[in-house]
Amino acid sequence: MKKQRIVVKIGSSSLADSHGGISTEQLSDHVAALARLKEEGHEVVLITSGAVAAGFSALGYPSRPVTIKGKQAAAAVGQSLLMQAYTEEFRKYGIVTAQLLLTRSDFSRKEQYSNAYATLGELLNRSALPIINENDSISLEELTFGDNDMLSALVSGLVSADMLMIFTDVNGLYDKNPQKNADAKKYYFLPEVTEEISSLAGDAGSKLGTGGMKSKIDAAKTALSLGVSVFIGTGRGQEKFVDVLKGKGDGTYVGNAPQKEMKMNKQWIALHSLVSGQIEVDAGAATAIIQHGKSLLPAGVTNVSGFFQVGEVVEVVTQQGRVIGKGQCTYSAEELRDVKGMQSQDIQVRGERHSYEVIHRDHWVSL
């Protein structure tokens, strides 16, 4: 089996015991299986939930807290307990672990996003096993990842993973709830995530987790768009992750055909960047960009909205108002208003400018 880069996401329900603490048995089972992946020569990144579930009982809560301050306090206690347990277990296999705590804002800021990319690359090159969790103790509720499902998809794209394995307490996707319907049909393979498939997944999470099957399907769709195939399911024993790579996993495989990966810069533009303004273009420019992969030039710009600086991301629309994509603009809004509609040869070189593209095709993403 060729060396692969694997991202494994383990949810709260697959880690915590019935009382809310860390299940030593389950955690040891996961670590043994992850160590087997490393033993087979694969690079592994672990996305783990469980900080809140691990910490709430230590603070005296009888059950998982429902308030934001309660959840964040539990996460502050539980994250250290969770990491300590992982580190001790991985040490038995001679594996060095590294902790990264991320929030949504880390992805929206280009510099921090690039730093995360560089750090993960160096850790993997050094044969360490990165363990990533959302920084639950400071995350804003409206900016969370959904039990780390979406975080796992975004990280899998960031590191150009070959596969994302989302492990949960359900063995795959069904056409109806298998716990309530004996005739529920299981999907063993899905070539893509369609609207019909998305509608089958419920929103409810488990008692100890916040991400239901809907968030896992959404994560799978995002991972596929980034060129990463996905497995959603469950399993036990040391060989469970290796079995997934062999096509013998107990769950649903999603889009396991080779995909074209998206470059890091374009991932950031497409999924994480904040839009600072809007550029309207004529029909000729829209066709050149979308159908022929050309850069956007000032001649095709018909209107500029907002106040943005050089390097900020802007949305591009047709004269009918249809959004066709977004990209990093090489002009400020003020500069672009001065040169919109002009031919390149008619524009005076300003400052250190060496090119006239408004948005270069390498910094453009179609929507």
Curated annotation (Swiss-Prot):
Family annotation (InterPro entries): AceGlu_kinase-like_sf, Asp/Glu/Uridylate_kinase, G5K_ProB, Glu/AcGlu_kinase, Glu_5kinase, Glu_5kinase/COase_Synthase, Glutamate_5-kinase_CS, PUA
Enzyme Commission number(s) from the entry: 2.7.2.11
GO biological process: L-proline biosynthetic process
Membrane-spanning intervals of the chain: none
Principal cellular location given in the protein's record: cytoplasm
Binding site for substrate: 49, 136, 148
Signal sequence residues: none
GO molecular function, a single term: RNA binding
Domain of life per record: Bacteria
Subcellular location per the Swiss-Prot or TrEMBL entry: Cytoplasm
Pathway membership, UniProt: Amino-acid biosynthesis; L-proline biosynthesis; L-glutamate 5-semialdehyde from L-glutamate: step 1/2
Known role: Catalyzes the transfer of a phosphate group to glutamate to form L-glutamate 5-phosphate.
UniProt similarity note: Belongs to the glutamate 5-kinase family.
Name of protein: Glutamate 5-kinase
Gene (UniProt): proB
